[in-house]
Amino acid sequence: MKRNFPKLIALSLIFSLSITPIANAESNSNIKAKDKRHVQVNVEDKSVPTDVRNLAQKDYLSYVTSLDKIYNKEKASYTLGEPFKIYKFNKKSDGNYYFPVLNTEGNIDYIVTISPKVTKDSSSSSKYTINVSSFLSKALNEYKDQQITILTNSKGYYVVTQNHKAKLVLKTPRLEDKKAKKTESIPTGNNVTQLKQKASVTMPTSQFKSNNYTYNEQYVNKLENFKIRETQGNNGWCAGYTMSALLNATYNTNKYHAEAVMRFLHPNLQGQQFQFTGLTPREMIYFGQTQGRSPQLLNRMTTYNEVDNLTKNNKGIAILGSRVESRNGMHAGHAMAVVGNAKLNNGQEVIIIWNPWDNGFMTQDAKNNVIPVSNGDHYQWYSSIYGY
């Protein structure tokens, strides 16, 4: 027995070492067997710069917790799935890195979008910006145990499955030009299959982290009663949606609607002239005055402290943005609403924004005046109208 004892120890060590990775993988994922059917997204290259990956891993939980508190969600645990990329119809990446945020059921709750900074970005602490929103999370959850490619054009975002069927899963209200309508088509066969690598976006890449402490300690301030009651379609009424949302919140009512606001201000327009009309800052201020408010124009982005004070005092803020990519077209200018603000665990200050195109909110660095939006464009926050 004594002579065999060392052999038994060696065998037990070999056995324990051989099963350790599997055991750790199971404990790290913490997902039931029925939920282990992963969504696989085709990518040309799975590589992600180290500083991009580190930024996502370091900050995602604080960003997610700020949105959880805005949505009045309960405390939860999250981890990141494998990052993926989105491609344009010419098969070139849109330039962003997308990190899915997984809950313990194996579903995607949020998307962390990390983008290279654009020229007009006012902050300078990093080469990248980080924003968190729901974005494509709901759509991706519908493709468990499937291999897909995500493509984008001026109409929105498409999921292309292995049988080469494409579905528009997220529309953007931006109008494409007539030439684009004639020439753009859904890539098939050879186009899609050239993306050889696969990102398992619902597969946990690290242990789940509870946001219990972050939830209790993190400061979040929301404009009371702010709700998403309607979203912008194929029209130029972003300012109408923005003012309606802010006034519904500050008056705690449901009576304001974008179309009615636009009709009030442009009663003589009909057809496409009415559908694609927009508003000037002067018209936005005038409408606020007719509703018992005293809106003020500020020719810059509001600071974090200004947002904090105005939001606490139930005064809504409209964002006026100018598109960085192009000054032409209906959406060259765009209005959005400030929902609130938060201070993350690392001390970073963020502003919570609602884009009328979206069904959810997004985070924005309070020192960054360039806002990435859900159609891939960027808007420079050049002015604010506060006091709705």
Swiss-Prot record:
Keyword terms:
Hydrolase, Protease, Secreted, Signal, Thiol protease, Virulence, Zymogen
Question: What does the UniProt record say this protein does?
Answer: Cysteine protease that plays an important role in the inhibition of host innate immune response. Cleaves host elastins found in connective tissues, pulmonary surfactant protein A in the lungs, and the chemokine receptor CXCR2 on leukocytes. Proteolytic cleavage of surfactant protein A impairs bacterial phagocytosis by neutrophils while CXCR2 degradation blocks neutrophil activation and chemotaxis. Additionally, promotes vascular leakage by activating the plasma kallikerin/kinin system, resulting in hypotension.
Q: What class of enzyme is it?
A: hydrolase
What organism is this sequence from?
Staphylococcus aureus (strain MRSA252)
Per the UniProt entry, the signal peptide is 1-25
The subunit field of the Swiss-Prot or TrEMBL record says: In the cytoplasm, prematurely activated/folded ScpA forms a stable non-covalent complex with ScpB.
GO annotation, biological process: proteolysis
Identify this protein by name. Staphopain A
GO MF terms held by the record: cysteine-type peptidase activity
Which cellular compartments is it found in? Secreted
Q: What gene does the UniProt entry assign to this protein?
A: sspP
Predominant localisation class:
secreted
